[in-house]
Amino acid sequence: MNCKAVTISLLLLLFLTRVYIQPTFSLISDCDETFNYWEPLNLLVRGFGKQTWEYSPEYSIRSWAFLLPFYCILYPVNKFTDLESHWNFFITRACLGFFSFIMEFKLHREIAGSLALQIANIWIIFQLFNPGWFHASVELLPSAVAMLLYVGATRHSLRYLSTGSTSNFTKSLAYNFLASILGWPFVLILSLPLCLHYLFNHRIISTIRTAFDCCLIFSLTAFAVIVTDSIFYGKLAPVSWNILFYNVINASEESGPNIFGVEPWYYYPLNLLLNFPLPVLVLAILGIFHLRLWPLWASLFTWIAVFTQQPHKEERFLYPIYGLITLSASIAFYKVLNLFNRKPILKKGIKLSVLLIVAGQAMSRIVALVNNYTAPIAVYEQFSSLNQGGVKAPVVNVCTGREWYHFPSSFLLPDNHRLKFVKSGFDGLLPGDFPESGSIFKKIRTLPKGMNNKNIYDTGKEWPITRCDYFIDIVAPINLTKDVFNPLHLMDNWNKLACAAFIDGENSKILGRAFYVPEPINRIMQIVLPKQWNQVYGVRYIDYCLFEKPTETTN
């Protein structure tokens, strides 16, 4: 682990994974990513996209400043190259992955300097075999970017806790200020324990000076972001405050996060078991006894405690602490291995066994995510290869119904294709469309019709199926009273163009949905423990398909 060649190999593998493998193969795990970030970014780059109520100037709880760095990358790509539109999607993901690599590389160097090179290398291994990080680090979400920025904050926190450097304390807070003001104000919670540490260990005068510097950084960052968002919305738009007001201060039974679903207290423990190998979680608990870093561990547990108390829970809410979990685990693993320094053979056996279990469980989870949940991206990508020589209309309508929430991004659609929603069993508020005429500011500032913050259905967002040119759906039974498209009984000359395998959640067992088991092992388990194994493992797939309604031709 101390060998320079090992370090270089791990970093090269990390770079390859973050910049190529993840952007290419990772899934989109949340429709909020699609409709609240990919679609507005598509509007900035290509002039059209779906619009959620959060982007209505009436509510303005999503930040355009958050999207501007990605627009600045994609604008020259589209201006000076002839790349097809779907490349915007993968280039953006690659940029996120590259940013993740840079943050991880710098933290690796800091861990090596402040703690030990072996701990740093173990941390990289735990980061590589981290199913949660695999998809989170290339997601276009404020919580995902906050996760990456907090790696930068952790780097400076380590330096501060090792040297007492005030400048590194300030830099750590600056990273978190940026993450909070750009779109997710709750990450400020993570800095509270570090602030307490500084307060307890410095004189009043020094604390006041540092507080002034931090307030200045916070104010300048907030001013820049608020001015940017206010220009886009055409009115004063303190987005971070609006998010806090909607989700906490003004939350009620009719509006607020809880109307989108609530989960029990054990949702997050189960989620962590899916996103981290079991040895990493066990080691992370042991790592908190490295008391020199107590402000970091206090941040970790404060975050879990605060979000466990909230009825509305989502996987992405835990993203910012992912790096702390692997850091704590790597410290603990290093200390455990040192207990066996006098028994080198046993030490090597323990090290190899733990790393193999970590890698095996992580790969099982990652392969399951790719195999089970990436069909929507694969199917929508087919539009880039379809022969559009005989385009049937200036605008081609790509429709979907019950599968609306699996739509990945309009970047996967050609320039003249638009996503439309037909009637289905969904009874909440669907996204509408940004206007396509006028300047970008006019499109953003126009008050959309039929928007509300109570998730109330709006019929104005329905599209008649008779005006659909393509349709995306799973080949599964429908609700005959609510769904208007039946993929099992195609009518009106609809043809099946392309399909990809998608997990059948209702008919798959819990382990089959969550983990991939190689077929030889699956067969062995069916022989050894047939009854018990079949109760917990089984995978069934359905087709996720693209259908076309051919144009009528005249002789």
Curated annotation (Swiss-Prot):
<feature type="topological domain" description="Cytoplasmic">
    <location>
        <begin position="1"/>
        <end position="7"/>
    </location>
</feature>
<feature type="transmembrane region" description="Helical">
    <location>
        <begin position="8"/>
        <end position="28"/>
    </location>
</feature>
<dbReference type="InterPro" id="IPR005599">
    <property type="entry name" value="GPI_mannosylTrfase"/>
</dbReference>
<feature type="topological domain" description="Lumenal">
    <location>
        <begin position="29"/>
        <end position="62"/>
    </location>
</feature>
<dbReference type="GO" id="GO:0006487">
    <property type="term" value="P:protein N-linked glycosylation"/>
</dbReference>
<keyword id="KW-0472">Membrane</keyword>
<feature type="topological domain" description="Cytoplasmic">
    <location>
        <begin position="135"/>
        <end position="176"/>
    </location>
</feature>
<feature type="topological domain" description="Cytoplasmic">
    <location>
        <begin position="338"/>
        <end position="349"/>
    </location>
</feature>
<keyword id="KW-0328">Glycosyltransferase</keyword>
<feature type="topological domain" description="Lumenal">
    <location>
        <begin position="371"/>
        <end position="555"/>
    </location>
</feature>
<dbReference type="GO" id="GO:0005783">
    <property type="term" value="C:endoplasmic reticulum"/>
</dbReference>
<keyword id="KW-0812">Transmembrane</keyword>
<feature type="topological domain" description="Cytoplasmic">
    <location>
        <begin position="235"/>
        <end position="268"/>
    </location>
</feature>
<keyword id="KW-0808">Transferase</keyword>
<dbReference type="GO" id="GO:0052926">
    <property type="term" value="F:dol-P-Man:Man(6)GlcNAc(2)-PP-Dol alpha-1,2-mannosyltransferase activity"/>
</dbReference>
<dbReference type="GO" id="GO:0000026">
    <property type="term" value="F:alpha-1,2-mannosyltransferase activity"/>
</dbReference>
<feature type="topological domain" description="Cytoplasmic">
    <location>
        <begin position="84"/>
        <end position="86"/>
    </location>
</feature>
<comment type="function">
    <text>Mannosyltransferase that operates in the biosynthetic pathway of dolichol-linked oligosaccharides, the glycan precursors employed in protein asparagine (N)-glycosylation. The assembly of dolichol-linked oligosaccharides begins on the cytosolic side of the endoplasmic reticulum membrane and finishes in its lumen. The sequential addition of sugars to dolichol pyrophosphate produces dolichol-linked oligosaccharides containing fourteen sugars, including two GlcNAcs, nine mannoses and three glucoses.</text>
</comment>
<dbReference type="GO" id="GO:0005789">
    <property type="term" value="C:endoplasmic reticulum membrane"/>
</dbReference>
<protein>
    <recommendedName>
        <fullName>Alpha-1,2-mannosyltransferase ALG9</fullName>
        <ecNumber>2.4.1.259</ecNumber>
        <ecNumber>2.4.1.261</ecNumber>
    </recommendedName>
</protein>
<feature type="transmembrane region" description="Helical">
    <location>
        <begin position="87"/>
        <end position="107"/>
    </location>
</feature>
<comment type="pathway">
    <text>Protein modification; protein glycosylation.</text>
</comment>
<dbReference type="GO" id="GO:0006488">
    <property type="term" value="P:dolichol-linked oligosaccharide biosynthetic process"/>
</dbReference>
<feature type="topological domain" description="Lumenal">
    <location>
        <begin position="290"/>
        <end position="316"/>
    </location>
</feature>
<feature type="topological domain" description="Lumenal">
    <location>
        <begin position="198"/>
        <end position="213"/>
    </location>
</feature>
<feature type="transmembrane region" description="Helical">
    <location>
        <begin position="177"/>
        <end position="197"/>
    </location>
</feature>
<keyword id="KW-1133">Transmembrane helix</keyword>
<feature type="topological domain" description="Lumenal">
    <location>
        <begin position="108"/>
        <end position="113"/>
    </location>
</feature>
<feature type="transmembrane region" description="Helical">
    <location>
        <begin position="114"/>
        <end position="134"/>
    </location>
</feature>
<dbReference type="GO" id="GO:0006486">
    <property type="term" value="P:protein glycosylation"/>
</dbReference>
<dbReference type="GO" id="GO:0052918">
    <property type="term" value="F:dol-P-Man:Man(8)GlcNAc(2)-PP-Dol alpha-1,2-mannosyltransferase activity"/>
</dbReference>
<comment type="similarity">
    <text>Belongs to the glycosyltransferase 22 family.</text>
</comment>
<feature type="transmembrane region" description="Helical">
    <location>
        <begin position="214"/>
        <end position="234"/>
    </location>
</feature>
<dbReference type="GO" id="GO:0000030">
    <property type="term" value="F:mannosyltransferase activity"/>
</dbReference>
<keyword id="KW-0256">Endoplasmic reticulum</keyword>
<feature type="transmembrane region" description="Helical">
    <location>
        <begin position="350"/>
        <end position="370"/>
    </location>
</feature>
<dbReference type="Pfam" id="PF03901">
    <property type="entry name" value="Glyco_transf_22"/>
</dbReference>
<feature type="transmembrane region" description="Helical">
    <location>
        <begin position="63"/>
        <end position="83"/>
    </location>
</feature>
<feature type="transmembrane region" description="Helical">
    <location>
        <begin position="317"/>
        <end position="337"/>
    </location>
</feature>
<feature type="transmembrane region" description="Helical">
    <location>
        <begin position="269"/>
        <end position="289"/>
    </location>
</feature>
